[in-house]
Amino acid sequence: YDNLLQLRELALKEVAMRVEKKVETQVVAEGKLYHEYLMAVIDSSEKRARRVIRKTARLATYMNAAFIVLYVQSDKEDMDRIPLANQRYLINNFNLASELGGEVVRIHSNRHIETIVDLCQERKISTVCISGPRFSLYSLFVTTFRFRHLLNRLAKLNVDLIILS
């Protein structure tokens, strides 16, 4: 019973904070004077993508910032190649991002890092949020190299990187 009360109180605080931020930013939104602009980068996985979207939306609310959700669709993730269940999860995650006030950007590219960096420059992104990279023994070297490359490219643009658990 105590857990339910705590959850209810937390939900009420979250809703109250969102309403307060919405009222505060109503005037700001007309002039597009956001100081921070967050970008959540997702893949076609259900739970990890949903978690990244929710945490980025929460961060954007705390920071009084706008956020976008980027899905970079590679050739191996073409709609005719991924299972219908994953397609459904992806659409549900896009809808979730829109419901939470984010903009969904879907780009077809096999160059994920360059796409992320280009969008950061184009949209003046201040913070990129990703889920933790998946390391396996087989792909440890390649994944580490790509991660370092992303980190270095974002550092040159003075863009922060947040790795969400």
Question: Where is each model-derived feature located?
Answer:
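Small/aliphatic-rich secondary-structure junction motif
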Residues: G31-Q87, F94-S98, V105
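Structural beta-alpha unit
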Residues: L5-G31, L100-V128
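Charged helix-capping and loop-helix junction motifs
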Residues: K55, A85-Y89, V142-R148
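Structural motif
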Residues: V41-S45, S109, S131-R134, S165
